[in-house]
């Protein structure tokens, strides 16, 4: 009988921390800087928005092609400064080959490094962009689900990346 259960009519209690208290890390702990080499790293940016489509929020991240994991991520505007923050997070890692699409800022930032510019060699990270859009409704382009604050937008996506890739 449903009325006899002590939990009938009440939501189950979980010990999930509130999203505002989350402090997701921005770099993986699975790969040790200096001791492990990242042979192929793909870099890309993904568009999202907070509140209205005119308030754009970009996710920049690097993906280890062989380990199939995200190495580091940052949020911000689609500028050289945000790309620079991502590159500073990636500086402790030994990356042999960088693979990006044709965005000109990648070319200027990766000057002097082994850099492949091709849509063919960014298939995995582009596929992962689609996976993120499928798993996180707030990243969908035409959706009723969207982030209302920049803080929660960054924390929810960062927490997802922590669970899937960084632990």
Curated annotation (Swiss-Prot):
UniProt keyword annotation of Manganese present: no
**Is Coiled coil a UniProt keyword of this protein?**
no
Q: Name one GO biological process term.
A: DNA transposition
Q: Per the record, a Pfam family? A: DDE_Tnp_IS1
Membrane-spanning residues: none
Q: Which GO terms describe its molecular function?
A: DNA binding; transposase activity
Keywords assigned by UniProt?
DNA recombination, Transposable element, Transposition
Similarity comment: Belongs to the transposase 27 family.
NCBIfam families linked to this entry: transpos_IS1 (NF033558)
Q: What does this protein do?
A: Absolutely required for transposition of IS1.
Which protein are we looking at?
Insertion element IS1 4 protein InsB
Organism of this sequence: Escherichia coli (strain K12)
């Amino acid at each position: 009988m449903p009325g006899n259960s002590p939990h009938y009519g009440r939501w189950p209690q979980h010990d999930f921390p509130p999203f505002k208290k989350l402090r997701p890390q921005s770099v993986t702990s699975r790969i040790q800087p200096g001791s492990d080499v990242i042979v192929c790293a793909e870099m890309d940016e993904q568009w999202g928005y907070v509140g209205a489509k005119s308030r754009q929020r970009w996710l920049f991240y690097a993906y280890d092609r062989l380990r199939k994991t995200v190495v580091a991520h940052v949020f911000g505007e689609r500028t050289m400064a945000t790309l620079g923050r991502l590159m500073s997070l990636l500086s402790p890692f030994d990356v042999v080959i960088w693979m990006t699409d044709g965005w000109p800022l990648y070319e200027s930032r990766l000057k002097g490094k082994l850099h492949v510019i091709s849509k063919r060699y960014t298939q995995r990270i582009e596929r992962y962009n689609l996976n993120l859009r499928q798993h996180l409704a707030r990243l969908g382009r035409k959706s009723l689900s969207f982030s209302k604050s920049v803080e929660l937008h960054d924390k929810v996506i960062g927490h997802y990346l922590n669970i899937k890739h960084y632990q």
